[in-house]
Amino acid sequence: MLLLPRPANYHLNCQKLYQFLVASQKNCDRNCSQIVSISLEIDSIDPLALLEKLARPHQLNFYFENKSKGEAIAAIDAVAQLQLAGANRFHLTQKFIRSCLKETDIFDSSNHTFAKPYFFCSFSFFSEATADYPFPVATVFLPRWQIARQGDRCVLVANLSIEADTNIDVFIQQLWRKIHEITSIEQPENEGNHFQREFSQVDVSSIDRFKQAVIDCSELIYEQQLSKVVLAHAIDVQANTNFNLFKCLNRLRQMHPDCYVFSTHNGKGQNFIGASPERLISIRDRQLFTDALAGSISRGKTTAEDTVLANQLLQSEKERHEHRVVIDFITQSLQELGIAPQLLSPRLRRLANIQHLWTPIQAKVPIDVHPLEIVAALHPTPAVGGVSRQLACKKIRTYEKFERGLYAAPLGWVNHQGDSEFIVGIRSALIDGDRARLYAGAGIVAGSNPDREIAEVRLKLQALLKALI
């Protein structure tokens, strides 16, 4: 059965689509092409299931889900892409998006939030890589196929290239054939995702080295050279079989429903995945939301113990100071862009195995400020970098003997009208066949204790490992 628009609208849509494509083709010069973005509402389906069926090892793809909001989006293959490095990567990405949009005609029969062109982006923590790392410093692509679900509504977006000599009838036939293939994919039965594999794990650098780094940074903080620095630790996991990306993602969204579950594939066999509690920015209709998320403690085994731990977190001078540093940085960075932030009441962000101090921040974005300008201003926040930013990042390079890559870095999307959502790629792992590198970090401020900091890191790593193994 062809799961396309309802029969009453099918002929009308085909007729309108044909007229749209003919008009778009007239915009093509003899030696150039035009991108057409075609959106169509389809029956509800799990975007992760489609990603599993349609993803190919040699193609870029991206997955982004916020289960608590009932939103999931899968982007598959690229009709246009850019990969680059350097300090001006955010600006060049912004130019690329604007250039693509100038060459894109839009056909939307769905009136869906996730219709029309969306550009998917990943940026590494540092603007230049110092070690061999499988992902570029910056990647942005317009997907050839995009499937998004919001609540019980689902939209398919096809971004395709059309040329001056394209046969429109054949083009439409091929499009409907592909749509039929996509919408005919059967969603798998829930087979259960409890799987155990044999594995070994090793610290990328020693625990003693991490503890010494905490001591050294604490001395710099005492000397007032730094206010905060975030130190990461990584473990390498070797399994006896290849990791099943889609089962891992499914486990992550089941285990961490209050987090952003994400995955990006580089087209060369490696995936970067995770479940991040930290939103960098979310913009809808020029309304900005961001999070100050810093200061943490474990969850209790009982309700009473959980309450005791929460009160300890709320009353901890060290944790509150760490949180305040992040708030001050975000508000100042937004003000420098001409954005007036409003702080909502502070609260706790309770996750499966950890709880954080959390202050939501919102603001109205001026019409002349692009989302990537905000991303560039905020990254890295003190929640993943430190204060002062430049010295903290220098110390991170000194003490961490591995490439952060996409860890603690911005991943997300920007659409055609300036809506955007980016998360911070923490609680994450680099997957390569039967190998995985898992990352987690801890914020070092005045009063930090090396044993407590490594315990916090291990808590975060074990939660991620549980989803993979």
Q: Each PLM stretch: what is its role?
A:
Residues M1-A87:
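An N-terminal JmjN-like helical accessory module and its immediate linker preceding a catalytic domain
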Residues M1-H11, Q15, G151-T183, A275, ...:
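Cytosolic ligand/metal-binding cores
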Residues L2, P7, R98-K228, A234, ...:
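Non-catalytic accessory segments adjacent to catalytic cores
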Residues P7, L40, S200-I207, Q238-N242, ...:
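Hydrophobic alpha-helical scaffolding
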Residues F119-C121, V229, Y260-H265, G405-G412:
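A short glycine-rich, hydrophobically flanked beta-strand micro-motif that places a catalytic Asp/Glu
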Residues W145-A148, V261-S263, F272-I273, R279-L280, ...:
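Short beta-strand scaffold segments in enzyme catalytic cores
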Residues E189-R279, R324-V326, L337, A352, ...:
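Active-site pocket-lining segments that scaffold enzyme catalytic pockets across diverse folds
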Residues P360-I469:
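Conserved hydrophobic core element of enzyme catalytic domains
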